[in-house]
Amino acid sequence: MDRDSVIIFDTTLRDGEQSAGAGLTVDEKLIIAKQLESLGVDVIEAGFAVSSTGDFNAVSLIAESVKNCKVASLARVVEKDIDKAAQALEKATDPRIHTFVSSSAIHMEHQMRKDPEEIIEMAVKAVTRAKKYVDDVEFSPMDATRTDMDFLITLLEETISAGATTINIPDTVGYSVSKEFGESIKLIINKVKNLSLIHI
């Protein structure tokens, strides 16, 4: 896919299900996935395979049933998450593993209890492990809009070097307004040395 093309990444079946009262059965998720496929969505994030048997089964069924777009499973930067995502995606025509780790100072200190070097190491290991299973690996630095920009650039460069093919810049807590977010994306495009090889 052309690097300059716009890719539609739909996370209704994963992030959307976190909305109050939005629980879906496996069959309902498949119906939605088939509709998304018919609409021409490029990537369907089908679920978080390690989180529950239901999510694993949904990702597996969607991976087997959807043929005209990529199917992704979310995974933390943890070996068991990566392995479970890969297992759920085994029958996918075009599988993607989407791995993420907290990157803001507040999340690193209070949620992860890790320093920046440890976060980079965890992210690189996760991307490297995911690449053993699939060609297409997406990486997200969670809470990116509150992350120190120099650290964010280093983290992105390291994960791209490890094999990430798509970089997602999430505004996890709704911290950034549109203009600020746009400026951050411009800065990332201008500063990340190896960004030209991947999608953002």
Locate predicted features.
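N-terminal capping/small domains of soluble enzymes
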Residues: 1-78
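Short glycine-centered, acidic/aromatic-flanked micro-motifs in structured strand/loop junctions
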Residues: 15, 46-48, 141-143, 169-172
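Conserved small/polar residues in nucleotide/adenosyl-binding loops
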Residues: 198-200
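Alpha/beta enzyme core
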Residues: 24-39, 64, 79-137, 144-194
